[in-house]
Amino acid sequence: MAGMKEIRGKIKSVQNTRKITKAMEMVAASKMRRAQERMRAARPYADKVRDIAAHMSRANPEYRHPFMVSNEGAKAAGIILVTTDKGLCGGMNTNVLRASLQKFKELEGQGKTIEATAIGTKGLGFLNRLRAKVVSNVVHLGDTPHLEKLIGAVKVQLDLYSEGKVSAVYLAYTRFVNTMKQEPVIEQLLPLSADQFERKEEDGATPSTQWDYIYEPDAQAVVDELLVRYVEALVYQAVAENMASEQSARMVAMKAASDNAKTVINELQLVYNKSRQAAITKELSEIVGGAAAV
């Protein structure tokens, strides 16, 4: 009976665990939908800023913003690493950290040192374990990231590039593909290339360049501000995609945990039933044996 009592305890324990993972799955599903909405809402802003900046760059070809000038001579490279603050989201963080480590080795092979910015506690811990130089970080963004919280950490990287201290700035995050698929990506954030400003309309034509703005105070000041806002929007978009990926990965991970818990419960229930059947059979045998002896 002690064995049966122990099995009942295990079944109860796994059932309680399954209740927790099921609840976490439902919470993650709800947060995932909101994260996807934020991700989609961020895209039009970045697209519009890009279109305006592209038009102004074409209208004022004599001016080149520092973000569009190459710093090949710099001995360092910057990277903004976007991860989650929490775990229990499958291999999502592991994948983007592995990709980042490969990028670090590639840059170090080119003789570059790393100037890193961490967004998320998992990435910050990873960089600290590597003893990498962390020039800025922001953690505990919560479920609703605000651009104001990101600007300070991102500005450090933008200033490093503007001052010619880094040859390029890379952005590492997890791109949201769909609910079941998220992929780690590392994109070059700076210098900005002309290709980034080329966006085709739905009919395949490029946006019209026949009109112009009235600039206040002047075109250069507006371009300077626009390009900073554009880069900030790209980082915010990456953070929004990373959060949508996090909730999707967590929902899938918790569903898998719930399914596995159900399988374990069924197996334990089968063992319990067999033990109970064996105990009953033994008692019956003892009763029959006692009756025969009398």
Swiss-Prot record:
GO terms for cellular component: plasma membrane; proton-transporting ATP synthase complex. Keywords: ATP synthesis, Cell inner membrane, Cell membrane, CF(1), Hydrogen ion transport, Ion transport, Membrane, Transport. It holds the Pfam family ATP-synt. GO terms for molecular function: ATP binding; proton-transporting ATP synthase activity, rotational mechanism. The keyword Iron-sulfur does not apply. SUPFAM superfamilies: ATP synthase (F1-ATPase), gamma subunit (SSF52943). It is a peripheral membrane protein. GO terms for biological process: proton motive force-driven plasma membrane ATP synthesis. It is found in: Cell inner membrane. Gene3D superfamilies: 3.40.1380.10, ATP synthase, gamma subunit, helix hairpin domain. Produces ATP from ADP in the presence of a proton gradient across the membrane. The gamma chain is believed to be important in regulating ATPase activity and the flow of protons through the CF(0) complex. Belongs to the ATPase gamma chain family. F-type ATPases have 2 components, CF(1) - the catalytic core - and CF(0) - the membrane proton channel. CF(1) has five subunits: alpha(3), beta(3), gamma(1), delta(1), epsilon(1). CF(0) has three main subunits: a, b and c. This is ATP synthase gamma chain. It comes from Paraburkholderia phytofirmans (strain DSM 17436 / LMG 22146 / PsJN). The gene is atpG.
